[in-house]
C-alpha cells in the first residue's frame, strides 16, 4: 500500500478574514476587467454583498455534498437488502476500497486539524478517484438481472452530483488541480482497476458491486464532512 502523500511543502495557514478579502477582491477585479471598467474603490456594501455571495456558494455545496452522501447510503442499503442478505461480503469490504492508499482522515476532529488547502485536496482526490468506477459501474448495472431502476437512477444522479462537487472545488481552489491529478496518477489502481467489471461468476460480481457501493458510501461521507468544514470556516461558525 502506497504511503499517504504529504502536503507539507504546500502549507497554507487558514486565515478566514484575509482569505475572504483576497478572494472577494479577485472576483470583483475579474468581473470589472471583463467589462472593460476600471476598478473603483469598493465600498463596504459591495464587500458585504460579495461576501454573502461567497458564503451562499459554500452553503449550496454543503447541501449538495449532504445529498451526495445521503443518496450513496440509500443506494448501498437498497443493494444490500436485495443482494447481500445472508452473505459475508461486508467482512472484506473496507479492505478492498480503491481509495485506501490515500489514507484520508476518517474522523471529523482529525479533518478539522487540516488547513483549507489540504482539505480541498483530499476532497478532490476522492471525487476524481470515483470518476472511473462510477462510469463503469453505470455501464454494468444496466446489464444486471432484476436490478431496480431506482438503483440505476441513483447511480446516475450520484455521478452528476460528483461532477458538480468537482466543479465547485476546482473553481474555489484552482491551484490544487494539477497536484491532485498527479497524485492520483501515481496510484494507478484508482484508474485501471475498473476498466473491466464483468465476471462470469455471479456471486463474485455481486461481491464486487457490494464493495463498490460500500466504499462509495464511506468516501461520500468524507467528502460531505470536508466540504461542511470548509463551509463553516467560510461562515466563521466553526
Swiss-Prot record:
It is found in: Secreted. GO terms for cellular component: extracellular space. GO terms for molecular function: hormone activity; metal ion binding; prolactin receptor binding. GO terms for biological process: cell surface receptor signaling pathway; female pregnancy; mammary gland development; positive regulation of biosynthetic process; positive regulation of lactation; positive regulation of receptor signaling pathway via JAK-STAT; response to nutrient levels. Keywords: Disulfide bond, Glycoprotein, Hormone, Metal-binding, Secreted, Signal, Zinc. It comes from the Eukaryota. Residues 1-36 form the signal peptide. CDD domains: prolactin_like. Disulfide bonds join 97-215, 232-238. Zn(2+) binds at residues 66, 224. Glycans are attached at residues 70, 92, 146, 160. It holds the Pfam family Hormone_1. Belongs to the somatotropin/prolactin family. This is Chorionic somatomammotropin hormone 2.
Amino acid at each position: 500500500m502506497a504511503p499517504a502523500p504529504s502536503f507539507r511543502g504546500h502549507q497554507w495557514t487558514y486565515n478566514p478574514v484575509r482569505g475572504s478579502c483576497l478572494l472577494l477582491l479577485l472576483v470583483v477585479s475579474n468581473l470589472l476587467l471583463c467589462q472593460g471598467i476600471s476598478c473603483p474603490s469598493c465600498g463596504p456594501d459591495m464587500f458585504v454583498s460579495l461576501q454573502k455571495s461567497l458564503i451562499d456558494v459554500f452553503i449550496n455545496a454543503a447541501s449538495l455534498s449532504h445529498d451526495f452522501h445521503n443518496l450513496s447510503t440509500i443506494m448501498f442499503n437498497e443493494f444490500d437488502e436485495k443482494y447481500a442478505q445472508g452473505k459475508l461480503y461486508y467482512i472484506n469490504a473496507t479492505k478492498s476500497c480503491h481509495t485506501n492508499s490515500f489514507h484520508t482522515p476518517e474522523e471529523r476532529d482529525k479533518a478539522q486539524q487540516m488547513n483549507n488547502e489540504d482539505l480541498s485536496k483530499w476532497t478532490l482526490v476522492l471525487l476524481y478517484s470515483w470518476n472511473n468506477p462510477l462510469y463503469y459501474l453505470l455501464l454494468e448495472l444496466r446489464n444486471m438481472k432484476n436490478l431496480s431502476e431506482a438503483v440505476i437512477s441513483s447511480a446516475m444522479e450520484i455521478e452528476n452530483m460528483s461532477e458538480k462537487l468537482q466543479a465547485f472545488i476546482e473553481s474555489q481552489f484552482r491551484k490544487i488541480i494539477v497536484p491532485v491529478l498527479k497524485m492520483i496518477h501515481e496510484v494507478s489502481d484508482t484508474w485501471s482497476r475498473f476498466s473491466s467489471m464483468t465476471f462470469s461468476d455471479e456471486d463474485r460480481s455481486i461481491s464486487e458491486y457490494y464493495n463498490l457501493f460500500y466504499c462509495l458510501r464511506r468516501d461520500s461521507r468524507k467528502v460531505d464532512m470536508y466540504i461542511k468544514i470548509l463551509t463553516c470556516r467560510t461562515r466563521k461558525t466553526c
